[in-house]
């Protein structure tokens, strides 16, 4: 069973399953109009920066983030791409290990907001951004989450003129 098959089962069961992919980054690995196949499976799908075979400065305008949010409570991020060559099933680029991070609890809310912000840009609708609820604990997680530190996922985008990533790094360096 592939990840796509599992997502289809969840979407058909009534869960809100959404996918955003960077078309320029997938131009050599996914079929043209891949989003139509995804939507036919009942999965909501939007394409970031649809590929157009012309030389343009927007070819470098990419969204390389990997964000997965499950139930608004568990999130995954990191550098891992979803393809056989990244799990050493197929040798294409050599062998390496990449990092993936799982977060649980309130920090995941930031991933939800980042995803919905991009979704809003791609769909042209701000409706969902107006109703993002604050983080809510789920009843099936009995134990409270505890930590010695502070986790604050953040996002940066070329779509605005704010230098969030640069500011975060400069603040860390200046500590």
Label the model's feature ranges.
Residues 1-175:
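Charged, low-complexity intrinsically disordered terminal segments
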């Amino acid at each position: 069973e592939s990840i796509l098959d599992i997502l289809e089962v969840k979407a058909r069961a009534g869960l809100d399953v959404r996918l955003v992919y960077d078309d320029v980054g997938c131009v050599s690995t996914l079929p043209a109009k891949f989003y139509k196949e995804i939507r036919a499976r009942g999965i909501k799908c939007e394409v970031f920066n649809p590929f157009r075979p012309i030389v343009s400065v927007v070819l470098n305008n990419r969204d390389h983030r990997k964000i997965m949010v499950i139930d608004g409570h568990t999130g995954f991020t990191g550098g891992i791409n979803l393809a056989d060559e990244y799990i050493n099933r197929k040798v294409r680029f050599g062998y390496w290990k990449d990092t993936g991070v799982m977060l649980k609890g309130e920090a995941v809310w930031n991933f939800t907001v980042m995803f919905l912000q991009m979704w809003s840009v791609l769909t042209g609708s701000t409706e969902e951004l107006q109703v993002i609820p604050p983080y809510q604990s789920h009843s099936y997680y009995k134990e409270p989450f505890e930590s010695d530190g502070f986790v604050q996922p953040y996002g940066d985008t070329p779509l605005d003129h704010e230098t969030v990533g640069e500011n975060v790094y400069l603040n860390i360096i200046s500590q």
